[in-house]
Amino acid sequence: MQGGNSGVRKREEEGDGAGAVAAPPAIDFPAEGPDPEYDESDVPAEIQVLKEPLQQPTFPFAVANQLLLVSLLEHLSHVHEPNPLRSRQVFKLLCQTFIKMGLLSSFTCSDEFSSLRLHHNRAITHLMRSAKERVRQDPCEDISRIQKIRSREVALEAQTSRYLNEFEELAILGKGGYGRVYKVRNKLDGQYYAIKKILIKGATKTVCMKVLREVKVLAGLQHPNIVGYHTAWIEHVHVIQPRADRAAIELPSLEVLSDQEEDREQCGVKNDESSSSSIIFAEPTPEKEKRFGESDTENQNNKSVKYTTNLVIRESGELESTLELQENGLAGLSASSIVEQQLPLRRNSHLEESFTSTEESSEENVNFLGQTEAQYHLMLHIQMQLCELSLWDWIVERNKRGREYVDESACPYVMANVATKIFQELVEGVFYIHNMGIVHRDLKPRNIFLHGPDQQVKIGDFGLACTDILQKNTDWTNRNGKRTPTHTSRVGTCLYASPEQLEGSEYDAKSDMYSLGVVLLELFQPFGTEMERAEVLTGLRTGQLPESLRKRCPVQAKYIQHLTRRNSSQRPSAIQLLQSELFQNSGNVNLTLQMKIIEQEKEIAELKKQLNLLSQDKGVRDDGKDGGVG
């Protein structure tokens, strides 16, 4: 009865006018909570349950979609206005109109994406031609004809790639978690360069803006001890996208073990973006302890590579196999290079298997057993100065020469003057990038190069300096929203990374100084085996130094300990190092004096030349005066 009265009272409240006074409820109902969750397991995928009132639809920002729309506008402008200047004006006007309508962002209409729009325009033209051909054909046409058209569309992407059109890929120089570096030859000028390719996943506006900003920062680095920058551009690439409704087929693909992964495996760190502060060393093999640097040489001679099952192929009829590119006349590209350039591989942790094979059998193992879908991602290409000799190679060669010396107290093969010159140029380069507000975060001998006959130091591989492009856990802002050089992500190579990097705490430019301390030790302390090197470099974290180094190089040993202090605030800065006694010892003073003497001799010779010219001019004038008097 009470429930019926409450229902009557509720109806009276709903139907009563403004002057009615609402009576208190007879039952105290609990406060309203969130809407109940409904079981949607039996709802077809094409039907979506409406949980909220209808709202005005919004247009989510998708860079790939907006770039395609901008390319369509530019294509239409060229079709309807043959004059290039007027076509450009029409295109700008259309972009402004779409921006005002909220359909486009001004960001996607910028000139930085002109190469991508050119790629789209060519693909659109080819697509229109293919569509016309398809309409003119018999509707009952064989499916092989459609597959050939699709294969040509994929081939078109390779033909419109600036990287494939302008450069000949010769060798891979290095690979890490942030991209691969290739040695290439420019087809026009015949010169050799290094090109780094970085796959940008999830191309949002924020990510693209960071990429462009960081590229401009790297382009502004002009210093004798920094690897030279030439240009950069962005291209579209296919990325394998597995279908969830098909059975997975594993595909082994060629993958060279990177330098960073090798160092991580030595330290017992898993191959991911984070590293651990606990370092575990592998036991030496019972046959013999591996010599320092021998692993690289043996791998190169035997062409031993590492295969990783990191690609998932699922059966579908959506895309033609990229191996057909080779059959359709793309000469000069191996199967592995086509897969790498056109279909950057997508790692699947559940199917990851590793096995060792040889390079000759790579093409036999790369087989597309099924068909796949593809997603478009952006690939950043950075063209740089080619430096093939790294400081790591130099140290390995020096250590090989030094094994014939038994007396460690002498160590003539260390070449103190050369090592000091290398370290001084390295510190000058680090001082420059720190003044530019950049923290390298991965300084190690493999990322330091010696260029030219005078072996000038060049700092390269700024991949980790741009980690905030690809990593979400990097903190570049403070509470005021201003950019600061303080970071919290665990990046770097474990033997050279500072304690704060390995612990994942905040770090700054002083982390690079720790890495410099480790490099300084390697320059003045030779190692016979890799195990010995790992033990000594790890001992730096507790202040341990080889006694032979303390006796031979007391000044260097002193600054190695200063640079590798656990408290980052107690480490010297780059400018403090340059002004220290480290570069003011007797050997350096003699070298500096010799350089000054050479410069003074050149200056004296130039002055003598000028005096001779002046005396000749004076003699000519005197002869003229004498002739006039006569």
Curated annotation (Swiss-Prot):
Site positions (Heme-binding): H80
Enzyme class name: transferase
Biased composition range(s): Basic and acidic residues: 285-294
Keyword terms: ATP-binding, Disulfide bond, Kinase, Nucleotide-binding, Phosphoprotein, Protein synthesis inhibitor, Repeat, Serine/threonine-protein kinase, Transferase, Ubl conjugation
PROSITE patterns linked: PROTEIN_KINASE_ATP, PROTEIN_KINASE_DOM, PROTEIN_KINASE_ST
A GO CC term attached to the entry: cytoplasm
One Gene Ontology term from the biological process aspect of the record: phagocytosis
Record-linked InterPro entries: CC_SR_Kinase, HRI2_3H, Kinase-like_dom_sf, Prot_kinase_dom, Protein_kinase_ATP_BS, Ser/Thr_kinase_AS
HRM repeats: 410-415, 552-557
Phosphothreonine: modified positions: T285, T486, T488, T493
Consequence the record notes for mutating I448V: In LEMSPAD; uncertain significance; mildly reduced phosphorylation of eukaryotic translation initiation factor 2-alpha
Annotated stretches, region: Disordered: 1-40, 259-301
ATP-binding in keyword set: yes
Pfam families: HRI2_3H, Pkinase
Active-site annotation: D442 (proton acceptor)
Residues reported to bind ATP: L173, G174, K175, G176, G177, Y178, G179, R180, V181, K196
GO molecular function: ATP binding; eukaryotic translation initiation factor 2alpha kinase activity; heme binding; protein homodimerization activity; protein serine kinase activity
Domain of life: Eukaryota
TM spans (from-to): none
Disease: Leukoencephalopathy, motor delay, spasticity, and dysarthria syndrome: A disorder characterized by delayed motor development, speech delay with dysarthria, hypertonia, progressive spasticity, hyperreflexia, and bradykinesia. Cognition is normal. Patients manifest anxiety and attention deficit-hyperactivity disorder.
Subunit details: Synthesized in an inactive form that binds to the N-terminal domain of CDC37. Has to be associated with a multiprotein complex containing Hsp90, CDC37 and PPP5C for maturation and activation by autophosphorylation. The phosphatase PPP5C modulates this activation. Homodimer; homodimerizes in presence of heme, forming a disulfide-linked inactive homodimer. Interacts with DELE1; binds both to full-length DELE1 and processed form of DELE1 (S-DELE1) in response to stress, leading to activate its protein kinase activity and trigger the integrated stress response (ISR).
PANTHER family linked: EUKARYOTIC TRANSLATION INITIATION FACTOR 2-ALPHA KINASE 1 (PTHR11042:SF160), EUKARYOTIC TRANSLATION INITIATION FACTOR 2-ALPHA KINASE EIF2-ALPHA KINASE -RELATED (PTHR11042)
Similarity annotation: Belongs to the protein kinase superfamily. Ser/Thr protein kinase family. GCN2 subfamily.
Function: Metabolic-stress sensing protein kinase that phosphorylates the alpha subunit of eukaryotic translation initiation factor 2 (EIF2S1/eIF-2-alpha) in response to various stress conditions. Key activator of the integrated stress response (ISR) required for adaptation to various stress, such as heme deficiency, oxidative stress, osmotic shock, mitochondrial dysfunction and heat shock.
The protein's name: Eukaryotic translation initiation factor 2-alpha kinase 1
Species per Swiss-Prot/TrEMBL record: Homo sapiens (Human)
